[in-house]
Amino acid sequence: MQLFVRAQELHTFEVTGQETVAQIKAHVASLEGIAPEDQVVLLAGAPLEDEATLGQCGVEALTTLEVAGRMLGGKVHGSLARAGKVRGQTPKVAKQEKKKKKTGRAKRRMQYNRRFVNVVPTFGKKKGPNANS
């Protein structure tokens, strides 16, 4: 039966169905130079085991096998590993309601009381409203 193998290029193999996936990998390695241990053979998106024969895997005539390179995995280094860390750790706190600011006559009354009525006479130079002392 005929079998299509899509690696870097599309290849056509003539097989009997008794070949193992490892034999297909070796054939692709000789054609394209990709080491067999770096290949992943996929049938309809599912990886195939090296020891399994094509008949056991459900490969029929005119089926396309895909050969993908093995991706190196592991930890992410650098700033990508910390992305979103602070926001994820910060607890959500409900916003507090603020008092409405006074306007007009009430605001002027509050300013008058602060400046002239509640004043405690002190000695020395007069300090401004933002002085830290």
UniProtKB/Swiss-Prot annotation:
It comes from Homo sapiens. SUPFAM superfamilies: Ubiquitin-like. One of its GO terms (biological process) is innate immune response in mucosa. The modification N6-succinyllysine is found at K125. InterPro entries: FUBI, Ribosomal_eS30, Ubiquitin-like_dom, Ubiquitin-like_domsf, Ubiquitin_CS, Ubiquitin_dom. This is Ubiquitin-like FUBI-ribosomal protein eS30 fusion protein. Coiled coil: none annotated. Keywords: Cytoplasm, Nucleus, Ribonucleoprotein, Ribosomal protein. Gene3D superfamilies: Phosphatidylinositol 3-kinase Catalytic Subunit, Chain A, domain 1.
